[in-house]
């Protein structure tokens, strides 16, 4: 038998395996993302019950099976975030947050800041309605934790402050472009309004945001494009999130 470990983890995904078992993707504070084989999880309600549902915070006992796979020996719910599960908009946001986390990080690389940020965001959803700017904050925090933080205070190309003139955001170059460098933007570059740039800077500093629906839609599109450039694809949960967007408070 391999090494054993006791971890605090969020369930990112749970996939049925055969008629009796499941493979779960966990994001742990101590060891980062890992896959665990839950023997008998489907055939016995007594063994794991509802513990392995996505975006559940649990304490897990695991045994290394070899390669990148662990065996899940026992698990107990630390926080189930049950309140958010009765609201479609909050489910959509939580699903997006866990999929974004799963896609941004590599296996077995601890990201304590991202883990704490994910748990904090799930707690926000559990305690109140889904708010668009809370999700924008989580996106920025997730990008920062993964080493992909967009440049918002200095031009992504020349490093100088963007100034007060018209600015563009180029996800391929990694952030905002000043007026002088705006012409170097690629196909995905787009204008970014002063209000949205200020709002995103405030979120990046950890401050609050006062902005309207128009600014929110622009910020969503800009960060969405940034994430898609880094991942090379559009997340499945983002499509669901866009469908329920009008339901967000």
PLM-predicted stretches and their roles:
Residues 1-249:
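Non-catalytic alpha-helical scaffolds and adjoining flexible linkers that form interface surfaces
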């Amino acid at each position: 038998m391999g090494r054993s470990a006791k971890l605090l983890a969020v369930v990112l995904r749970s996939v049925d395996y055969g008629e009796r078992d499941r493979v779960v993707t966990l994001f742990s504070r101590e060891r980062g993302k890992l896959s665990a084989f839950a023997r008998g999880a489907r055939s016995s309600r007594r063994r794991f019950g509802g513990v392995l549902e996505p975006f559940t915070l649990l304490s897990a006992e695991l045994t290394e099976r070899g390669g990148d796979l662990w065996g899940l020996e026992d698990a107990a719910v630390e926080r189930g975030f049950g309140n958010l599960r009765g609201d479609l908009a909050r489910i959509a946001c939580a699903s997006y947050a866990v999929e974004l986390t799963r896609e941004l990080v590599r296996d077995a690389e601890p990201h304590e800041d991202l883990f704490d940020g994910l748990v904090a965001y799930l707690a926000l959803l559990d305690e109140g309605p889904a708010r668009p700017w809370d999700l924008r904050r989580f996106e920025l925090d997730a990008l920062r934790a993964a080493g992909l933080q967009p440049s918002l205070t200095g031009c992504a190309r020349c490093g100088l402050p963007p100034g007060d003139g018209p600015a563009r955001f180029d996800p391929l170059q990694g952030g905002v472009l000043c007026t002088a460098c705006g012409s170097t933007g690629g196909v995905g570059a787009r204008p970014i309004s002063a209000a949205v740039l200020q709002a995103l800077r405030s979120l990046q500093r950890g401050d609050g945001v006062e902005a309207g629906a128009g600014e929110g839609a622009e910020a969503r599109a800009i960060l969405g494009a940034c994430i898609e450039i880094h991942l090379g694809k559009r997340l499945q949960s983002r499509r669901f999130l866009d469908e329920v967007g009008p339901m967000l408070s």
